[in-house]
Amino acid sequence: MAKIIAFDEEARRGLEKGLNTLADAVKVTLGPKGRNVVLEKAWGAPTITNDGVTIAREIELEDPYEKIGAELVKEVAKKTDDVAGDGTTTATVLAQALVKEGLRNVAAGSNPMGIKRGIEQAVATVTEKLLESAKEVETEEQIAATAGISAADPAIGAQIAKAMYAVGGGKLNKDSVITVEESNTFGVELEVTEGMRFDKGYISGYFATDMERLEAVLEDPYILLVSGKISNIKDLLPLLEKVMQSGKPLLIIAEDVEGEALSTLVVNKIRGTFKSVAVKAPGFGDRRKAQLQDIAILTGGQVISEEVGLSLETADLPLLGQARKVVVTKDDTTIVDGAGSEEQIEGRVNQIRAEIENSDSDYDREKLNERLAKLAGGVAVLKVGAATEVELKERKHRIEDAVRNAKAAVEEGIVAGGGVALIQAAHVLDNDLDLTGDEATGVRIVRDALTAPLKQIAANAGLEPGVVADKVSRLPEGEGLNAATGEYVDLMAAGINDPVKVTRSALQNAASIAALFLTTEAVVADKPQPAGAAMPGADEMGGMGGF
């Protein structure tokens, strides 16, 4: 395909126009009085949202240079969302402010590389200041306030805080898995699963011990973990006899249990001679192996596998895991209070955390996070209902963002919200970091850009942006504008805070893209096809050429 090329000022202006188009659509959502944006869908009802990254993803521009500019800013929003789960609109507003001032200075003759170095040093200094001023999250109320701001609903914030504590057994658990599901009932309900749950139920309904609830409950059972299939009862018999002598029930988790092995277990269960339940192992392939190993570590057992030189015929009781209780339904299995050592579980948790850090796949990260939570304490489900499908989608999305926001707050702490932390951290740049020339210009660009989020919040609330920014910059640290009421208050005391991870990620990602904009000297894009252009070889009537 033929290409078109733009150079120097033309290239940068094309990129900036695309950035501005996208940023102008996104920034109207910022703050408590921000507006929503309606997104048309090819199928189904339109989506109404105030989430920056969702809006950004939907925007496709026609002009090739503008399209590239918009795509670069989408990357800012997406990266911030990936890292912190929120702050996408703040990142977009910061990127727009940095690029606008930066390009103005480049057009006036400043060296882009000098400005870039100044921006990088200024951002590093401000990030350090933000981390220093962050306060640790210590109470359920603080999490509720943070999540409530993100979800634009204090009641949802309270439910998320409750979920984080419930999954951690009364302690704050940043690794907790909180999933959001659609519900037919109106409102938001919290359902907490104690222990480890995986989505495989009993192989046969005859294993159920409670016929009314159709579930099997095993108290203080042994747990046999097998990486392959079990079909021959002769392989299993020696171990079964030892378990029967102990007087404990048995949970078998294997790739499959079939044939005479399954029928023998069922017959003994029905006769009441031996209580057991057979369950298929969760997952597939390598993921199944990993999850079996997770269960082994959680329960203090070992996976019976030929890969490690273990077989069913020679297996003994010390190789079996144990738990206080196991509940199995037709759809899932829950293991409560596994007997694994805390040290080994912590080691496994750290290993999974490292895998999450090194993974490039969103899907893999999601699955690893689920495994992490199951080992670290349990799973909470927030069930969301609404009057219409459009409202349900919007609400569910807001809650998912708020959950990630709350986790970010626990991880690195919180700072004053409402754009105040950024504008007050800008004071560390007052002496231009003792830099000179174009590098000092870069520092000043960052200092000015740090006022942009607060100005936008004020504008969306119908206030005069310049007046608000000037007043807040003079207030003591942590005090600022509550845009919902128009009053100037101690924001932390009022529960208006942001996770510092969100704030710093927004700034760092915005600065990264701004530096790319400023140092661009040429843009190469695909040449647009004329509207209704015929395919090569097609005749004027639209048929195949030559026929």
From Swiss-Prot:
State the top-level EC class.
isomerase
The record ties this protein, via InterPro entries, to:
Chaperonin_Cpn60_CS, Cpn60/GroEL, Cpn60/GroEL/TCP-1, GroEL-like_apical_dom_sf, GROEL-like_equatorial_sf, TCP-1-like_intermed_sf
Q: Please give the Gene Ontology molecular function terms for this protein.
A: ATP binding; ATP-dependent protein folding chaperone; isomerase activity; unfolded protein binding
Q: Which UniProt keywords apply?
A: ATP-binding, Chaperone, Cytoplasm, Isomerase, Nucleotide-binding
Main subcellular localization, coarse class?
cytoplasm
> Which reaction is catalysed here?
ATP + H2O + a folded polypeptide = ADP + phosphate + an unfolded polypeptide
A Gene Ontology biological process term: protein refolding
Coiled-coil intervals? none
The record's subcellular location field reads: Cytoplasm
Any one annotated GO CC term: cytoplasm
> Subunit structure, per the record?
Forms a cylinder of 14 subunits composed of two heptameric rings stacked back-to-back. Interacts with the co-chaperonin GroES.
Protein role = Together with its co-chaperonin GroES, plays an essential role in assisting protein folding. The GroEL-GroES system forms a nano-cage that allows encapsulation of the non-native substrate proteins and provides a physical environment optimized to promote and accelerate protein folding.
Under the heading HAMAP family, the entry gives:
CH60
Q: What is this protein called?
A: Chaperonin GroEL 2
Q: Which organism is it from?
A: Corynebacterium efficiens (strain DSM 44549 / YS-314 / AJ 12310 / JCM 11189 / NBRC 100395)
Gene behind this chain? groEL2
